[in-house]
């Protein structure tokens, strides 16, 4: 009988311990009171999101209770869809694509994503229409009839390509479009399989840098009147300049840019998002990527339009005296 009571007591202790542990784990997942494993969606390895995401993820992991795992992805549009279904918590995106997601426009037509908020904007993402000297292409209009990579279907680069072609009186029907990643685009130009590529990313972009090793790179300029028309119709764009020396180009190139940003699921714990935001912006000196110089608290809420900022991030920026 005593043996039975001892066994019963042991079973009860183990059962209660299991329940307490399960409750603790569950509470940590909601409240942010313990370490949390979070996924940070970036982009392809040849872009800017992936290497920069690695550095930002490390800072957050080192300074907070969040363990960040950066993941490669198809970038902005795919990232928004992944946040929609709850398979990740944080993501890089272009500001225009995040806005389209919230509004249910463009590639999200009629299917808005309402479970996301902004942490901050980060740096300019330059629209680069890349070709080489040997292609003979010197303007956007020259792309007519050419084999051109326009990015993955529904990607940020794809939307930018369609809008820029439109402003120049062209459409996808006027080119031989191919849906390639940044790396694939660079490889395609190198191999002679395509003539040009639309790439929207922070400069210098890894894939284009690799291409410039063996090729004379040309970035096609956008004329001032076309820039103004584009900005008027699509206000998330801003005029941008690629400096001479980038990819060994001899003269600066006028083009346009959107902004990169960090997006988060709106139900992520406020205190945790505050700590993550604080970790990044209090330690920007640890970001060695070329785009790190643009990441400042003072500019973190620029270019977000009507997007809501997560309360945790808003709390940090309010402490810094920064508002939209």
Residue spans for each PLM region:
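Bacterial N-terminal signal peptides that target proteins for export
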Residues: 1-9
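Pocket-lining segment of extracytoplasmic ligand-binding domains
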Residues: 95-97, 105-107, 114, 135, ...
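Bilobed "Venus flytrap"/periplasmic-binding protein-like clamshell domains
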Residues: 35-68, 125-191, 307-312
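Ligand-binding clefts/hinges and TM-proximal coupling segments of bilobed small-molecule sensing domains
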Residues: 146-163, 234-306
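An extracytoplasmic/periplasmic, membrane-proximal ligand-sensing/linker region
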Residues: 180, 184, 190-191, 201-203, ...
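Bacterial signal peptide processing site
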Residues: 24-26
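N-terminal segment of the mature folded domain
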Residues: 84-118
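C-terminal motif of bacterial Sec signal peptides marking the signal peptidase cleavage site
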Residues: 18-22
């Amino acid at each position: 009988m005593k043996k039975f009571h001892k066994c019963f007591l042991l079973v009860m202790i183990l059962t209660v311990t299991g329940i307490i542990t399960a409750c603790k784990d569950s509470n940590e997942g909601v409240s942010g009171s313990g370490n949390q494993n979070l996924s940070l969606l970036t982009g392809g390895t040849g872009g800017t999101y992936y290497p920069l995401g690695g550095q930002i993820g490390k800072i957050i992991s080192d300074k907070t209770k969040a363990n960040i795992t950066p993941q490669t992805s198809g970038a902005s549009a795919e990232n928004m869809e992944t946040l929609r279904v709850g398979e990740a918590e944080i993501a890089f995106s272009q500001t225009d694509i995040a806005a389209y997601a919230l509004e249910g426009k463009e590639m999200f037509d009629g299917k808005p994503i309402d479970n996301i908020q902004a942490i901050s904007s980060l740096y300019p993402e330059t629209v680069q229409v890349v070709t080489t000297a040997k292609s003979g292409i010197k303007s956007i209009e020259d792309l007519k009839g050419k084999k051109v990579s326009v990015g993955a279907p529904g990607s940020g680069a794809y939307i930018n390509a369609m809008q820029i072609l439109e402003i120049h009186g062209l459409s996808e029907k006027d080119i031989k479009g191919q849906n390639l990643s940044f790396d694939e685009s660079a490889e395609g130009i190198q191999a002679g399989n395509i003539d040009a590529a639309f790439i929207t990313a922070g400069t210098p972009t890894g894939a284009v840098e690799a291409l410039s090793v063996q090729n004379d790179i040309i970035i096609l300029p956008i004329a001032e009147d076309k820039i103004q028309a584009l900005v008027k119709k699509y206000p998330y764009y801003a005029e941008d300049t690629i400096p001479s020396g980038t990819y060994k180009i001899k003269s600066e190139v006028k083009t346009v840019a959107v902004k990169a940003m960090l997006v988060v699921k709106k139900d992520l714990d406020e205190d945790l998002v505050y700590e993550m935001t604080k970790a990044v912006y209090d330690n920007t000196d640890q970001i060695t990527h070329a785009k790190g110089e643009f990441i400042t608290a003072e500019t973190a809420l620029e270019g977000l339009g009507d997007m809501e900022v997560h309360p945790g991030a808003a709390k940090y920026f309010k402490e810094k005296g920064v508002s939209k």
